[in-house]
Amino acid sequence: MRKDAKENRQRIEEIAHKLFDEEGVENISMNRIAKELGIGMGTLYRHFKDKSDLCYYVIQRDLDIFITHFKQIKDDYHSNYEVMQVSLDYLLQFKIDNKALLQCIEAGNNKLRFYQSAFYQELFDFYYDLFKSDDDTYTKFKTDMLLQSLSTSVFAFQIEHRHISIEAYRNYLLNIYLDEVERND
């Protein structure tokens, strides 16, 4: 990418991040970002496919930091129960802190893109390793189902409409996804 194109892209990300922080992700359109920057929509869409794509890049630095700390959990805790409990606490807090950006990313036109993202793959690998069994198909299924239950929309629905506390949500997931032996370790 040319230097001026890189600078343009970085400027777009910075202004989008500022506007998202000030007015909320849901209140800012791609058109508003382009007007704020004094650029055409074509320039904006040359860098980002849609708002979901832009949100992914805006949060990318935070995702990288999150993944670094997330991976450390396996080194700091030894039982599957502890690893799962601490990782869920960390992930759920991250979802609370970044709810609007994550909802935008997950609600994008190309939902498959989120499931193919490095972030999703890191989460998948982390929990797949935790659930690993002789039945690879089952382990993949179990991991995908956990991650689906951790989607921002499912989490928000349970907290906001079912009025489940975050701690209860975490504990329910522990009960569903860890067998009794692992829970009592």
From Swiss-Prot:
What Pfam families does its record include?
TetR_N
Q: Which Gene3D superfamilies match?
A: Tetracycline Repressor, domain 2
User: HTH tetR-type domain: from which residue to which, for each copy?
Assistant: 6-66
Task: Report the DNA-binding ranges.
Answer: 29-48
Query: Which domain of life does this protein belong to?
Result: Bacteria
Annotated GO molecular function terms are: DNA binding
SUPFAM superfamilies with a match to the protein in the record? Homeodomain-like
**Keywords, comma-separated and alphabetical:** DNA-binding, Transcription, Transcription regulation
InterPro entries, per database record: DNA-bd_HTH_TetR-type_CS, Homeodomain-like_sf, HTH-type_Tx_Regulator, HTH_TetR
Name by which UniProt lists this protein: HTH-type transcriptional regulator SAS2464
| Organism (species) | Staphylococcus aureus (strain MSSA476)
